[in-house]
């Protein structure tokens, strides 16, 4: 059997780039909660003892930006300089301006356009991907790396592994078989975990705890064998972490946010952006399209691309490729997709309820992936049943 190796990585919520994503989305949530028509483009950067948020926000919401920043850092676990950042004593800089009136008139006519008339907030192209290799219809390498990262945070916060600190990275290599275009996972080849830790713990204890409390509950036994390689804190020391170890920036983890290197990516990040930004809303609707194609049995694996021009509601192009796994020709699936999904940004916002913030709705997306999550707030994960005969009508 001819097999190949494919690797996906993840970082958990204490990684400086991911901290920035979460702060940007916490700001978005707060804006949308008070004013669903908020226009938000919020970037965050961080380094030792400093967090800065900057960007363009037009909103009726009355917000305490500094409090949002500190609350988000504290919730992640950055409560002292020892762990990489002290949420209550770090410096917080805020440099937020209004959305450019040039953009506002072109995209939403200063809030006068009807939903179906709202133009894309920018040009760009976005991809959605789905594969039948996991129940989530997501790539296994990505699912395992992501779940290991989430589990790392869980055992830190519930006290199972008190030596853990917030920052950490995971990476999983899976051996695959290509079954006529569909991906079939055979085994897990390598598991890599690098996690921040305190001064009290030995490397042997780290390895033992990670195997017992993180890997064992997450990686199904059927994928592990005596040849599986484990790299557990291979650098030997990771005490300094978070923004103290590395600078962080919103939008630096777009592959972790999506499909772990599978499919394709148009380059646009998600966090801190309201739904007129097609980087986010466009990527969400094509995930729903790709997932619906696979869930409906039209293909075993699928990628969907959409593209936009600033100020124009209708997409410039829609593309479907099923990697030769389609039950009907790709051009027929494309026809079904165009009939079943409305790709206009204003309509995506309505159909996926993307103007609803609050309750950490978008904050939740900002760590452990935007796709393949079992949570009613992730409206783009709802499958639309698609029927083959639709194309023949």
UniProtKB/Swiss-Prot annotation:
Positions that bind ATP: 15, 167-169, 235-238, 246, 252-253, 269, 273, 277
**Where does the protein principally reside?**
cytoplasm
What are the GO BP annotations of this UniProt entry?
one-carbon metabolic process; S-adenosylmethionine biosynthetic process
Reaction(s) this enzyme catalyzes, per UniProt: L-methionine + ATP + H2O = S-adenosyl-L-methionine + phosphate + diphosphate
Name the residues that bind L-methionine: 56, 99, 246, 277
Coiled-coil segments on the chain, per record: none
Family to which the UniProt record says this protein belongs: Belongs to the AdoMet synthase family.
Subunit details for this protein? Answer: Homotetramer.
Tell me what this protein is called. S-adenosylmethionine synthase 4
């Amino acid at each position: 059997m001819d097999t190949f190796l494919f690797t996906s990585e993840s970082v958990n919520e204490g990684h400086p780039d991911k901290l920035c994503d979460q702060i940007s989305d916490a700001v978005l949530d707060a804006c949308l909660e008070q004013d669903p028509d908020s226009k938000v483009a919020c970037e965050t950067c961080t380094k030792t003892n400093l967090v800065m948020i900057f960007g363009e926000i037009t909103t009726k919401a009355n917000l305490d930006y500094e409090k949002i920043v500190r609350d988000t850092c504290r919730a992640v676990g950055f409560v002292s300089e020892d762990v990489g950042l002290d949420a209550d004593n770090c410096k917080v800089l805020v440099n937020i301006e209004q959305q450019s009136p040039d953009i506002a008139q072109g995209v939403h006519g200063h809030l006068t356009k009807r939903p179906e008339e709202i133009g894309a907030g920018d040009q760009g192209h976005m991809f959605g991907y789905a594969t039948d290799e996991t129940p989530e219809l997501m790539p296994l390498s990505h699912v395992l790396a992501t779940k290991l990262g989430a589990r790392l945070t869980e055992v830190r916060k519930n006290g199972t592994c008190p030596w853990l600190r917030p920052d950490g990275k995971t990476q999983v290599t899976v051996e695959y078989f290509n079954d006529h275009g569909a991906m079939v996972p055979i085994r897990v080849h390598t598991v890599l975990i690098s996690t921040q830790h305190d001064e009290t713990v030995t490397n042997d204890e780290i390895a033992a705890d990670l195997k017992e409390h993180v890997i064992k509950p997450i990686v199904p036994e059927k994928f592990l064998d005596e040849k599986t390689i484990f790299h557990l804190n291979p650098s030997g020391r990771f005490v300094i972490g978070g923004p103290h170890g590395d600078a962080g920036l919103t939008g630096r983890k777009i592959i972790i946010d999506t499909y772990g290197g599978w499919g394709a990516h148009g380059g646009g990040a998600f966090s801190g952006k309201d739904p007129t930004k097609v980087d986010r809303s466009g990527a969400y609707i094509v995930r729903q399209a790709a997932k619906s194609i696979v869930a409906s049995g039209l293909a075993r694996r699928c990628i969907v691309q959409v593209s936009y021009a600033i100020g124009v509601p209708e997409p410039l192009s829609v593309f479907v490729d099923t990697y030769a796994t389609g039950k009907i020709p790709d051009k027929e699936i494309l026809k079904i997709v165009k009939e079943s999904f409305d790709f206009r940004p204003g309509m995506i916002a309505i159909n996926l309820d993307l103007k609803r913030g609050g309750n950490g709705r978008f904050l939740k997306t900002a760590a452990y992936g935007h796709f393949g999550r079992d949570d009613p707030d992730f409206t783009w994960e709802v499958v639309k049943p698609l029927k083959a005969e639709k194309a023949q009508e």
